Amino acid sequence: MRIHSSFVALCSFQATFAVASTAWPWQTFKSSPHEPPSLKVSKSGPVSPGYLFFDQSWDAHQYSVFIMSDNNELVWQSPPGDLKGFRVQQLDGNPVLTYFNGLGVPEPFGWGYGIIQVLDQSYSSIHNVSVINDNYTALGSINSSSFVSWIDMHENTMTSEGTMLVTGYNVTQCDLSSVGGPKDGWIADSLFYEIDVKTNDILYRWSAKDHLDQIPLEDVQPFYPVDDWGHNSSAPYGYFHINSVEKFQDGSYLISSRYYCSLFKIAKNGSVDWTLQGQTGGDFELKGIQWAYQHDGRIHHEQEDGFVLSIFDNANSDVSNGTHHTEGMLIHVNLATREASSLQTLHDPKDEIYAVSQGNTQLLPGGHAVMGYGSNPKIKEYSSNGTCVMTAQFGEDGVVASYRAYRSPWVGIPTTSPDLFACSDESNNKTQVFMSWNGATEHKKWKIFGGNTRGNLHPVSIVRKTGFETTASVVGGLKYVRVEADGFGIEKGVSKVVSVKEMC
């Protein structure tokens, strides 16, 4: 593995992205073309088991999603693309990977158009969750003729019923005169869907615009005023900005609106059951807590009279920022008394972050929590008492972004062949062998075979796997090499035969 840095890098996928100006280092390998970021990791206590799952964008060296270990070793890197919301979920009792794949529209808009891709443990794509035609109009400056799906990047939550909750943004006309905008104005309407993962059948659809009587435009003005927005389809007023969806046990939904600074319970008939607003409380009394511009509202420990809510409290946005640090919040929502009270807040006093966009809070089974900081490319893990025990950074603040970050156990069983590079160290009568297998987690050793003819190779060494790329020095000047991954349950870990390069 080599660590590199540069002041110029260019990434493209379905659109041309900005030239990177960051000097944040990345890794390179002899056997593999992948170039993940070099994680700067600090720990002050035990962390939970599992790998880190994250995406990177903005001026990142490579637009991809990554599985990496705490010790800065790559496990798997995807092909390049504008990919977001990368995590492990369950489908039919089996672990799968899910992420948005499409076109992200950067701030000040901050939404996207694409599919949710579902991969199995071999990293094969098994489902593309899509909304193909729902009378959408794209942002006026975007050519949507090649779009295959209109799903937005903000959500991809799998339910136990084999459905997925996703979001969408539709540019449409709306009367904005009540808040000082044009009567024939334009908005970015926020929608969410529940979709059958295997058939793409839409089982439920909700639109914020359809419920302006219960969620009026006037209520959002203190947090996201209309100003000059809404005069045309290229600058629609994105007043609601949906960014997460969860499902209650009774079949209703919990949705998060960034600019209303609110979470809403949406009944099965589409009406708004209640509003939990981060500054005023809405239909609840706030007991010593406040939040603003939150992301990632999640339901935990649901009971008849209440539940625990976790949110990523940005407390900052493009409208208002720099006055209060970002933190994770665990909130007890008492439905009987209509009170919301703090159970725990999560932030690192040694590294206060002001995340103006994106981010998430993941509660782990053992009591720890992981937070991805969105516009600030950091992942932090907190112990059960709220102490930060790990920070992993992969870019400069405000230069590289990551929509969400997670920690999860994962077993990867790729069906692709391992990658291999070999070169001659003639002066020392040795052959240098570099081997890797993108996504493989289960092999412990490498068997190396070599010889002077392609069809007559014999065992020359067995070496322990030492990371994403393992390097071995084999005595003798070989002409051809192949390797095999060795470990429990490994069936397809055989590389192609490669010729040994004359120079390393």
Predicted regions and their residues:
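Fungal secretory targeting signals
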Residues: 1-20
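Histidine-/acidic-rich catalytic cores in large beta-rich domains
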Residues: 17-504
